């Protein structure tokens, strides 16, 4: 069963629905780039027209089993335009200590993850990946992750 916190993150992070543009100088979700877990640049503009579920994850978290739910959602809805993007972070209790290679191996071996995963990033605070800073500035503090 998908837990309550997982649904909270879905509601908070599915900001691609809002793709609002307040002026020509305002960024949107699709203006960002992020490194994949393989070290390649992932240009989010390639997902225009899709619904994006951006979720921070960790391999040693009590919610690690959410990978099963994320993969199921991705499998069920990818043909309808849903893209799940997992962003590993070590900011919550040191629960993602591994390298990108270790994280990728863990996800593929234990959960058969096929949705895009990124490099490990900070998701809150001054050193957060710019997409998280943008989300906070654009949609408010409620978009700042509180846990994995």
What are these regions (language model features)?
Residues 1-8:
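Bacterial N-terminal signal peptides that target proteins for export
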Residues 22-45:
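N-terminal "domain-start" segment that seeds a small globular fold
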Residues 36, 56-60:
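Amphipathic alpha-helical repeat scaffolds
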Residues 9-16:
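Bacterial N-terminal signal peptides
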Residues 146-148:
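A short, hydrophobic beta-strand/beta-hairpin element that forms part of a small beta-sheet core
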Residues 63-129:
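Structural microenvironment flanking redox-active thiols in thiol-disulfide oxidoreductases
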Residues 48-53:
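Local sequence-structure signature of Cys/Sec-based thiol-disulfide redox active-site neighborhoods
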